[in-house]
């Protein structure tokens, strides 16, 4: 009888010990599915637009096309052999008469206008992430392991904000007789001399010329759009600290890989300050494989033995994707992306 009692006690003790060990031994695998929201992803369009003849050119009273953005100078009926002409015109005497140098100033934008549109933000898009975590070793409150994830996010960035275009502007100075005053002119009511005249005379060739690079030449209006899908994976070591009975803090970092698929389009019109419009439209598609790194922190709430709520934030650097499509260069900045995640996990 005594032997039976001792055997029963030993078996009971072993069962309790085994049960306690199983309870203390956490589940080593966890899979989770989370919503993943990106922040701090930006895109920008840049490029150039050729400044040629306006689609609807301005003309003189005699039908000649303006040879400056803000006026014209041509030889008059006499042939201007004396170096003077009354066949000229301008838009604004307040800004185009240089009284100190007895000159009429006429200007034109030449070459290409450089375009740099405002940044577009990709905040608030919705994606997902499927993650697998494996504990490898550790103590009762701290565990070390690794994670592998698959994630996706779709981005749609667009803008119709206007901006200034810069280019090369040439300003030519035409002399008039000292002591005389050119006819008045104002925007919308410019002065226009005729081929046959008579009228106020100025020199038919400039006595000086100034070229300025990178000066604002007009305003760009229209729209720009970039649709991008980003498939990715993260692989790296993990650290988990069980700081409370049902809660733990996780830290991780490592390799990030992304496959980005881009569709870009634009429809823009450049309106020169001195008149004339130029329109440019286009589109393009491309994809690229990006390599980078990430760092992440999260919190796990184990509301049952196997089920948990997982949430956190991730910093990811996949560099800057850049591609030219015709007259535009598109840049998608993935170098400082922030992702916020929230989902549910299952341990086994």
In which residue ranges do the predicted regions lie?
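Residues on the lipid-exposed face of transmembrane beta-strands in outer-membrane beta-barrel proteins
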Residues: 128-134, 148-150, 233-241, 253-257, ...
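Cleavable N-terminal export/targeting peptides
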Residues: 1-28
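Short loop/turn motifs that connect adjacent beta-strands in outer-membrane beta-barrel proteins
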Residues: 22-29, 122, 133-146, 157-159, ...
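Short glycine/proline- and aromatic-enriched beta-strand/turn motifs that initiate or cap beta-hairpins
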Residues: 21-136, 345-347
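Predominantly the C-terminal beta-signal and adjacent terminal strand-loop region
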Residues: 290-293, 298-348
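Transmembrane beta-strands of outer-membrane beta-barrel pores
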Residues: 35-41, 150-156, 255-263, 315-319, ...
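Amphipathic alpha-helical scaffolding segments
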Residues: 52-54, 149-153, 165-170, 254-256, ...
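Extracellular/periplasm-exposed beta-strand and loop segments of Gram-negative cell-envelope proteins
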Residues: 46-48, 99-123, 155-230, 260-290, ...
